[in-house]
């Protein structure tokens, strides 16, 4: 058979050449579990006469990917093969790549269609040698397969329909796009990105250095005015923001309710629903960057609004279509008074904003006083039992996963922006809390830190990270957090702003948002259960370090560049850090950092940024870096990815390595985990201690996750994207979770509600369930470490042969398939 090379020449396919090429890529991988010969044999079996070298590489990469269940290192091998193919079709020098992107000519119009802005191009061209020499191409070979494929599909810039950038070129483009000719910070940023020690958010990776560098993730708006000009101005603004790939949070507390008098026309209002349907269609029409994805709007409303019941039905599957707006995300901006009325089984009054003007500008005692006065003066459009409205909220959440639950009073009382006025909403993902009004539309630029990369050995004999012999390296975490804050502050200055109101807000208050990813990975590497006391302590100390480092960076910036414009009057100006607003003092913290000195510095010099931390979902960037999302536990221990050539199984890489070390990893063990839909709790051959570590989010008490959110909350000056995962959900369970969040003082009580029915994962698959149950009751034996015997002999098959077990696993696979083309349908890779 003949293979066609890139230059068009032909040569015979040789097994040795294929095998040697694959073997070269296995450096540093586990030689006991990576079989390059097996891959080569499968590749040879799959080729055809006239195959191109590029198709041959694709076949080899996906063949290696199909073996990922055998060992996680196959993911790195598959990625290396794919990266090697990309390197053959792209320029080696960063400057040449930038030149190609800058000089790109649209093939259809034959007009210039360059992707790089003049400033970035000029900096690169003047400093070719320095920048080209700083790029370390070998780091492209450190990606896992699906991380690289995500980059290739959506992030790396393309010309003529082909990928033009390599990952390292993208990282250098981002560094130069942010820092220009400040080469010290360019190199620092490149090194952090390239070594996967931090990542900027998706819009920054997409757009840094390009013609329109819109680098911000989040935008918050208040309805400009309750009038046709005000509503349509806001509609125009959200359309422009959405066009530039921003996610939107919009507060509509000030829009009058159904039946309210309209003075200008002597008519009555149709309420919020017809208006929101217009916003719904705008979200659908104005997609983000020419068909990448639909626009995303979260609509915030307070529960005293007289149209609240219509609002709660907007996303439901049943009912009149003219009363639905299913492409909008819904959120409640909930005052303490409502929660107290629900708790006390009290009455709840609903008002039209036109009857209680300005009440949305109040919180705490001022809001309660105005609300009670409005009740006493008979302004309510309707009075209902608070628990009846609560039931409707719970029903909507169980059916649709929304509305999000945010607590207005906690958000304002614990905000460093409280001197500006009342915060009226959060953003699309519930982690941003910033002030908005008709003249200011809030913006936030984000980055996240993979905390699992910040571990150091506690064994003096080796620097190797081993389970039970490592701890968090707070010094390294401090250094990266410091530079991340410096970077995000710079993004504010080089960012493209879609409206004048966004520019005014961001340059006056200069908020940033630092989050994390890989917390579950960190606990797995250390070898502790997600919600144990040690994990809770580590969780808090990680966020204390990040907050301290970011605050030091902001004070240092203030010394050089001045404090942010609205600093005076803020809690920080009075020496109050976020934990002080939660009622904690310096002595309540770890003792690791000198908060007393920092307090004196911030009161003397000010801070450059009003807000610093905002742990966000990190769905895409965590996948790129091969980490579990944000601060969440593992959703499952096994799931699949679908690509053009078929479905691939992904198994929790930490679990696989543990099982290999115990001699327990095999096809039968893999199939048992599949039958249990990613849970290991009903597999008694796995030691109990290991099962505790690898509990999925469905098997962890939500109370513990809420407690951990409160624990780190005292260091989070914005908020956090806290999802709730409740199996077999009912009103009592969900109500209990909400009230626990509220009573602990969380700002975000719930982002999405994720639910599933509590059905035995292996029922209905021809398995002898009685035998399985009996086995589980009698076989809670501890497996010695390591197990030397053949793992296959240790696995009880629940009354099935290996073939039957494999077939049953295949039958259940379709339920847990995730497509790279449609990730929104998968709970395993984020919201």
Regions found by a protein language model. Give the residues of each.
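Core nucleic-acid recognition elements
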Residues: 9, 32-172
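Extended active-site and interfacial segments that coordinate phosphate-rich ligands
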Residues: 18-25, 232-241, 256, 267-280, ...
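Core structural elements
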Residues: 51, 66, 142-156, 194-208, ...
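Long, structured ligand/cofactor-binding scaffold of large enzymes
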Residues: 59, 69, 93, 139-284
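Active-site cavity-forming subdomains of large catalytic enzyme subunits
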Residues: 85-90, 94-137, 216-463, 467-474, ...
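Catalytic alpha/beta core of large soluble enzyme barrels
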Residues: 120, 124-150, 430-436, 488-493, ...
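Internal maturation/activation junctions in enzymes
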Residues: 480-503, 507, 511, 529-618, ...
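Acidic, low-complexity intrinsically disordered tails
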Residues: 763-831
């Amino acid at each position: 058979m003949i293979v066609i090379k890139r230059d068009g020449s032909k040569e015979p396919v040789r097994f040795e050449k294929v095998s040697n090429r694959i073997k070269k890529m296995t450096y540093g991988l586990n030689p006991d579990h990576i079989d390059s010969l097996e891959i080569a044999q499968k590749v040879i079996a799959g080729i055809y006469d006239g195959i191109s070298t590029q198709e041959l590489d694709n076949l080899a990469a996906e063949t290696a990917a199909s073996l990922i269940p055998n060992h996680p290192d196959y993911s790195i091998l598959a990625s290396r093969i794919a990266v090697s193919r990309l390197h053959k079709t792209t320029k080696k020098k960063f400057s040449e790549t930038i030149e190609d992107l800058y000089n790109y000519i649209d093939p259809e119009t034959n007009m210039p269609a360059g992707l790089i802005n003049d400033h970035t191009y000029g900096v690169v061209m003047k400093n070719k040698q320095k920048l080209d020499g700083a790029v370390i191409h070998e780091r492209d070979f450190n990606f896992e397969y699906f991380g690289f494929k995500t980059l290739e599909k959506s992030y790396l810039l393309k010309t003529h329909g082909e990928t033009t950038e390599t990952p390292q070129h993208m990282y250098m483009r981002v560094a130069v796009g942010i820092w220009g000719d400040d080469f010290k910070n360019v190199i620092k940023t490149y090194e952090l990105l390239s070594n996967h020690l931090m990542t900027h958010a998706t819009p920054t990776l997409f757009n840094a250095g390009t013609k329109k560098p819109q680098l911000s993730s989040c935008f918050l708006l208040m309805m400009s005015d309750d009038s046709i000009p005000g509503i349509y101005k806001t509609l125009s603004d959200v359309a422009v923001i959405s066009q530039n790939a921003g996610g939107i949070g919009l507060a509509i507390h000030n829009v009058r309710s159904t039946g309210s008098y309209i003075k200008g026309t002597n008519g009555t209002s149709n309420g919020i629903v017809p208006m929101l349907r217009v916003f719904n269609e705008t979200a659908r029409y104005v997609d983000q960057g020419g068909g990448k994805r639909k626009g995303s709007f979260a609509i915030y409303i307070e529960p005293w609004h007289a149209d609240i019941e219509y609002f709660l039905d907007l996303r439901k599957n049943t009912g009149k279509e003219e009363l639905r707006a299913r492409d909008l995300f819904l959120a409640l901006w909930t005052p303490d008074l409502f929660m107290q009325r629900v708790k006390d089984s009290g009455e709840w009054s609903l008002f039209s904003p036109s009857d209680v003007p300005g009440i949305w500008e109040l919180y705490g005692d001022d809001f309660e006083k105005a609300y009670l006065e409005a009740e006493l003066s008979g302004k309510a459009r309707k009075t209902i039992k608070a628990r009846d409205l609560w039931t409707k909220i719970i029903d909507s959440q169980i059916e649709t996963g929304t509305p999000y639950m945010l607590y207005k009073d906690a958000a304002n009382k614990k905000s460093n922006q409280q001197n500006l006025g009342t915060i009226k909403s959060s953003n699309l993902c519930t982690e941003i809390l910033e002030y908005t009004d008709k003249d200011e539309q809030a913006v936030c630029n984000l980055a996240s830190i993979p905390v699992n990369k910040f571990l150091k050995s506690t064994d003096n004999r080796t620097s190797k990270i081993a389970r039970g012999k490592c701890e968090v390296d707070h010094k390294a975490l401090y250094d990266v957090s410091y530079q991340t804050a410096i970077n995000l502050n710079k993004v504010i200055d080089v960012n493209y702003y879609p409206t004048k109101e966004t520019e005014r807000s961001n340059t006056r208050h200069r908020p940033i948002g630092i989050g994390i990813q890989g917390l579950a990975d960190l606990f797995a590497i250390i070898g502790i259960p997600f919600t144990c006391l040690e994990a809770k302590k580590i969780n808090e100390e990680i966020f204390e370090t990040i907050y301290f480092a970011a605050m030091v960076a902001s004070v240092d910036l203030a010394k050089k560049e001045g404090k942010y414009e609205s600093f005076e009057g803020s809690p920080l100006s009075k020496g109050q850090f976020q934990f002080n607003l939660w009622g904690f003092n310096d002595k309540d913290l770890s003792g690791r950092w000198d908060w007393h000195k920092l307090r004196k510095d911030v009161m003397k010099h000010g801070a450059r940024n009003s807000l610093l931390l905002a742990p966000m979902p990190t769905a895409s960037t965590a996948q790129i870096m091969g980490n579990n999302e944000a601060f969440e536990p593992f959703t499952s221990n096994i799931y699949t990815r679908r690509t053009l050539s078929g479905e691939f199984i992904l198994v929790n890489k930490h679990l696989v390595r543990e099982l290999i070390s115990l001699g327990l990893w095999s096809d039968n063990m893999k199939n048992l985990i599949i039958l249990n839909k990613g849970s290991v709790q009903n597999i008694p051959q796995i030691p109990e201690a290991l099962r505790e570590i690898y509990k999925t989010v469905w098997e962890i008490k939500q109370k513990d996750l809420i407690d951990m959110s409160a624990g780190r909350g005292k260091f989070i000056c914005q908020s956090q994207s806290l999802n709730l995962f409740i199996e077999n959900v009912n009103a009592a369970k969900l109500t209990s979770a909400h009230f626990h969040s509220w009573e602990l003082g969380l700002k975000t009580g719930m982002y999405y509600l994720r639910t599933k029915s509590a059905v035995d994962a292996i029922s209905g698959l021809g398995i002898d369930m009685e035998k399985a149950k009996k086995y589980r009751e009698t076989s809670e034996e501890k497996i010695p470490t390591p197990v030397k015997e053949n793992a296959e002999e240790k696995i009880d098959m629940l009354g099935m042969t290996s073939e039957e077990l494999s077939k049953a696993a295949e039958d259940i696979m379709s339920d847990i398939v995730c497509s790279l083309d449609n990730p929104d349908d998968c709970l395993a890779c984020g919201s």
